[in-house]
Amino acid sequence: AENTISNTFNFQIVTYIDLRQNNSIESIITNIINIISNDNNEARDFAVLASSTKLLRNIDILYRQRTNEQTEITFISNETLERLKQIHQVTDEKAANWKFNRDFEALERTRKQLFTTDKRCLKISTIQSFKGWESPSVIVILENDIVLHNTTFRPMSPQTIYTAITRARENMYIINIGNDTYHNFFY
């Protein structure tokens, strides 16, 4: 279900998309691609923001596969993560060691430092890492708080939502993939 919500931030477009019943990664990507193509802007004018790097990694790789376009990310890519796991022989059965963690953190830090909004491609970032940046159009993905509680990431606090919303200069799109807390607020 798609809904245009009241606009107190003076955005040109504010759209809420409820994917709580169909929150597959394919459905999320299809909606992101449709938003970009229907907006008459280019992918470079968009940033996709969420709380979880795991979700964003999946969005990044599938978006690149479906569109054959590059992305600019604030975290290491799925491919880099898999290579790092191979180098350190990390598997589902064999946990990460301190060398893996050291290299992972160094690569993540470098990605954040190299991130820029000047590149001519879609930007994908955690909400926290996008603080201080802006984009003409922002797509915020509201994740399920229960899923987030089982990770190292904080649930979507009102401050986090505010930070995400205020990153957009012109257009705001919200894709809810399971967050009941904010559904009534945005719908």
Residue ranges, per PLM feature:
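Well-ordered, non-membrane alpha-helical segments in soluble/globular domains
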Residues: 25-33, 155-159
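Core RecA-like ATPase module of SF1/SF2 helicases and allied nucleic-acid translocases
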Residues: 37-187
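Inter-lobe coupling/hinge region of RecA-like P-loop helicase motors
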Residues: 1-30, 39-49, 122
